[in-house]
Regions:
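Histidine-rich, glycine-flanked metal-binding segment
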Residues: 2-3, 9-53
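Hydrophobic pocket-lining residues within nucleotide cofactor-binding pockets
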Residues: 9, 51, 68, 96, ...
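Acidic/polar N-terminal loop/beta-strand segments that form early-domain functional surfaces
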Residues: 24, 34, 61, 71, ...
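Divalent metal-dependent hydrolysis catalytic cores, especially in the metallo-beta-lactamase
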Residues: 61-63, 78-110, 120-133
Length: 133
């Protein structure tokens, strides 16, 4: 098991101070006060940072200098998800703003391919439009 500690931790219900996550493989085994962390557990201390679950954004037009309408490709999508991940957003729905059927189809293919490859963080596709009045 490994511990990740931070000055502030949000457990989904409350803000906790001086607590840690106890992680077993890919799963959170416990949230506990620092004093209760097993002494043999390797610990990553995030210092004065805040530890919280990853955020989900269901309408993402772009990120990392890429607008999904302009670059609805696998590479564009990878740049967007990577940019959002840096700021705590772990899952997104890339959005195509009202555009042509060809752009919408290309975007749908990029999202479908990313999901088929098991790329983390792409929940689906948000299509707007096809037209705004």
């Amino acid at each position: 098991m490994q511990a990740i500690s931070a000055r502030r931790l949000f457990d989904g219900n409350s803000w906790l101070e001086d607590h840690a996550l106890l992680v077993d493989g890919e799963h959170i085994a416990a949230v506990l006060p620092l004093a209760e962390v097993p002494t043999d557990a390797p610990t990553t201390d995030l210092g004065d940072m805040t530890l919280a679950a990853g955020l989900i954004d269901i309408q993402v037009n772009g990120g990392g200098g890429v607008m999904f309408n302009i670059d609805p490709s696998a590479d564009g999508l990878a740049t967007i998800t990577s940019a959002h991940r840096q700021y705590g957003t772990t899952a997104i729905m890339p959005t195509v703003i009202s555009d042509t059927a060809a752009v919408q189809q290309t975007a749908a293919n990029a999202v479908s391919d990313a999901q088929a490859r098991g790329e983390a963080g792409v929940l689906g596709l948000h299509l707007e439009g096809p037209h705004f009045d």
